[in-house]
Amino acid sequence: VEAAGGIILVPNKLSLQFFKPVDAGGTVLHSMQYSKDVLEADVFISFPILKHHNGTGLTMGLKNMMGLVWDRGFFHRTDLHRTIAECAAFKKPDLVIMDAVRGITTHGPMGPGTIREYNQLVFCTDPVAVEAYGAELFGDKP
């Protein structure tokens, strides 16, 4: 991947040196330390998996953006839903590829949870549409 000019990010294991302070422009999320690599990338592809989340109900294309922020604890301490929305609005991926081959339908994100086969990969340029489609797969109204 790197020889072809790409990078592999593992945000949970990165130090603060890989993040850049940015003005998030939100009403709750005013500023944040955001992934430098994503900010500087020519193309930004998000690859969430379809899963249940105890705090948000679902975690897919929008909540996935939290992984690009240094202090994710702020989201949980403040207003989880609003900060997720404001973070997702800050920098939208060029493409979202949701792995919905199998979905974790209960006790996410840590599990163990119930696994259901959906046998789908979802490709879209709109992370909100991916979220809505995933909610429908889970039987929820978006």
Identify what each model region corresponds to.
Residues 1-142:
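N-terminal and secondary-structure boundary signal
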